[in-house]
Amino acid sequence: MKYVDVILPLPLDGTFTYSVPDGMEGKVVPGVRLLVPLGKSKKYIAMATRLHDDKPAFSCKPVEAVLDNTPSLLPQQMRLWQWIGYYYMAPLGDVYNAAMPGGLKSTEKFKPKMELYVELASTYRSEQALHVALNLVQRALKQAKTLTTFLSLSHWDSLDGDTPREGIKKVTKEELMNESHCTAAVVKALIDRGILFTYELEIGRLNTNGESHLDLIKPLSLAQQDAYNGILMQMMKKDVVLLHGVTSSGKTEIYIHLIRKAIEEHKQVLYLLPEIALTVQIMERLHRVFGDRLGIYHSKYSDAERVEIWQKQLSDHPYDVILGARSAVFLPFKALGLVIIDEEHETSFKQQDPAPRYHARSAAIVLAKMYGAKTLLGTATPSMESYYNAQQGKYGLVELKTRYKGIQLPEIQVVDVKDLRRRKMMSGPFSPQLLAAVREALKNGQQAILFQNRRGFAPMVECKVCGWVPKCKNCDVSLTLHKSINLLTCHYCGYTYPVPTECPNCGSTEIMGRGFGTEKIEDQIAEIFPEAKIARMDLDTTRTRNAYERLIADFSEGRTNLLIGTQMVSKGLDFDKVSVVGILNADSMLNYPDFRAYEHAFMMMAQVSGRAGRKGKRGLVILQTKNPNLPVIGQVVNNDYEGLYQGILEERRTFHYPPFFHLINVYVKHKYDKVCEQASHELCKTLRSWFGVRVLGPDKPAVARVKTMNIRKIVIKLENGIDQQKVREYLKFAQQQMGKDPRYGALQIYYDVDPL
């Protein structure tokens, strides 16, 4: 009797064992999907991981069905799942759920998209027979018109004897009905006469049109060519290379040349981007060159589309290039040769909730090593960890210090808004310098971007008389005002509350919004520049599938000229006519209670500043802050990444933070705050007995209650080189001990490894 270990799509640790019936032995191999029972009545699609003869000590149920003829998961993917589960301390079932499209986990069989085609019956495929067919329908005018239209569309009307002069073209039933303006009944009548017949073809849901045109790849500039050669040289010695190139230096063009080289060597490429918005612009550039060799994969695609991409990657003719966001790292590859991670510093590459809380950059580097492939990290503002690894010689380093075609870096003007408010010179959140710059840009037919990293109308509303602030009933946060839907909304759980007309505490009607989000910026700037064509890019305006494409296309083509947005607008977007960028509130990024605050603020401001000044014109950035003398502000103005790095590095070394130490955040959650507090202290005491002063906490996080669950956080600082396996064994043991205590039956414990 054979047995198989499987992963179930449930948040459960480890694998489960089932017996393999005799008739299935040759079909059950690692990587195939199996239908298995669980409990009394439930059935799941499980992933086979290991076939063996080791009879378990317990009675196990048999596999009910094998759903694949060939594996849906390749060995390298299986190893990646196991690494993610181990390193990020996530149940394998959670990894399975994150990795596989829903259609491959459903008991309902995936249905390919079919199209109905119309064809001429074989009886009438000669010149003489066609005349007979036309005579048959000459009195049925609609049928005659439809048949004539079909013969023209399909080229059957160009017979030379019994052979068409042109190749026969497939005609869909829909196309025939549209061109002949007929109904389905007319087509059916021609079928009933035996003149036409219909058949189905799988057409797929993906746009695979377009041949590749590698000849359209532009030649590199001297600086780009030097960087390209440097990357190839470094890749001869290192598995991972960091390309540190200033904004607008033409890194994408270098990527395209590297992709071409990989394709010529019959290798596949994985090109990761942090945001779906970025894939829209890059996709157009890559599609012009690589055509149907390019596949796109991200969460805005339907489940059926993602299944089709997955299955194509397993076919004999997979995509040569996959462009995608975080989840694309899970796709199957048969011959992966190069991984490109653009904007590698972006926090969007880190999955937060739900588990697994993996970092796509780290996962992609591990995946590349499994294939013997090379990894290129590209950015204008490297993460501290990546730059440190490059400085230490673990990664190769190539620098590109000039913008493409000699375009200057933007001029950055720092505006002290505290001083301007004191002198009553501010117009809401706008300084006179910013308004003047935007006015000039619009007057000259240029465009402007206003950056505010907070969506909604106002972060909170408050009673002016008694100070009452409406809070979420499920979370420990104030509600955000969204004026467009006239609701107060929680950005953590989605709870909504009507905008109050009077204070429930004191009865006052003086209730007003505090602070400003992108929605309020949009309202106020429209009052100042009524002639401006304004667009807003944030989570609220990009929920639908094509929203990104529409917003970016409108701005690129000049249908809008003033773009307001959150961090989405900072991520590598390329707009020719943007001459002004306004950073409305630098302090909101700088004052965040996190050791990475200055690093992230510098990256955000440097990236959004890089959107200004392209195609031969120097841009202008207005940076508004209450603290103009902070060192990080000067570093942004001078584009001094090295200064930022050296300053922060010493602090990190002194206080035991990355890149010198690894962090693991341990979260304890419970419905009752008292139980949460007690359990977190007990867990912390246990961890301290093993890890000593490496353990900090427990503390309440910035938001200590989410979706009715109270939260405590314990931080563990682990020096580089420590035995990671031992650490994980200790943590799992401590969690198991807590689980045995009847007081903590409903307690949740989870981990965030290398948190951002």
Label each region the model flagged.
Residues 1-379, 391-407, 690, 724-756:
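Accessory, non-ATPase domains that flank or precede helicase/AAA+ motor cores in DNA-metabolism machines
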Residues 14-16, 172, 662-664, 710-712:
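Short amphipathic alpha-helical segments
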Residues 50-52, 100, 200-202, 452-454, ...:
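A general secondary-structure junction signal
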Residues 215-221, 225, 237-677, 685, ...:
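Inter-lobe coupling/hinge segments of SF2-like helicase ATPases
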Residues 478, 533, 694, 746-750:
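Residues at or immediately flanking beta-strands
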